[in-house]
Amino acid sequence: MALTLEQKQKVVAEVSEVAANAYSAVAADYHGLEVAQLTKLRNQAREKGVVLKVVKNTLAKRAFEGTSFECMSDKMVGPLLLAFSTEDLGSAARVIHEFAKEHKALEPKLVSVGGELFGPEEIERVAKLPTRDEALSILMATMKAPVTKLARTMKEVPGKFVRTVAAVKDAKEAA
């Protein structure tokens, strides 16, 4: 059953809204996945804050106009599942990459982050990007390191003085 013009406009608006608020997107060939497997993938994606959409490529191309995922439009061929990261950069890539390891029928085709298009070989690299919380903790540890080092150095001065006085005392007693 073909979609009416009104239904197509609704789909384009919906995908466009998701794309406008997403950090990254992954397009994967899902041909060969069974319904139960696709349902499992949707559940895993929902838990990780990833939005999955299966739409016609022409509608997706229209939805991507004016977004950072416009770069994907020329490379979209065949039946594709679109996964959008709404919480952090790597969540969609992580979900698709992990699921593709178990189910060979799911084949990542395109990855887009920040207006840059990457091939399927880059999905693992994007999947390994830290989550927002991990990135913040790394940043805080980096910022905290010089302060901690300074505190240790300042604490060491009196300790070194005490050890020097003790060494002089021991030397005088020995003489």
From Swiss-Prot:
Entry annotated with the keyword rRNA-binding: yes
InterPro entries cross-referenced by the UniProt entry: Ribosomal_uL10, Ribosomal_uL10-like_sf, Ribosomal_uL10_bac, Ribosomal_uL10_bac_type
GO cellular component terms listed in the entry, alphabetical order: ribonucleoprotein complex; ribosome
Pfam families: Ribosomal_L10
GO biological process, one term: translation
Origin: domain of life: Bacteria
Presence of the UniProt keyword RNA-binding in the record: yes
Keyword field: Ribonucleoprotein, Ribosomal protein, RNA-binding, rRNA-binding
Gene Ontology MF: a single term: large ribosomal subunit rRNA binding
Family: Belongs to the universal ribosomal protein uL10 family.
PANTHER family reported for this sequence: 39S RIBOSOMAL PROTEIN L10, MITOCHONDRIAL (PTHR11560)
Record's function text: Forms part of the ribosomal stalk, playing a central role in the interaction of the ribosome with GTP-bound translation factors.
Subunit structure: Part of the ribosomal stalk of the 50S ribosomal subunit. The N-terminus interacts with L11 and the large rRNA to form the base of the stalk. The C-terminus forms an elongated spine to which L12 dimers bind in a sequential fashion forming a multimeric L10(L12)X complex.
Record protein name field: Large ribosomal subunit protein uL10
Organism in which the protein naturally occurs: Psychrobacter sp. (strain PRwf-1)
Gene name of the encoded protein: rplJ
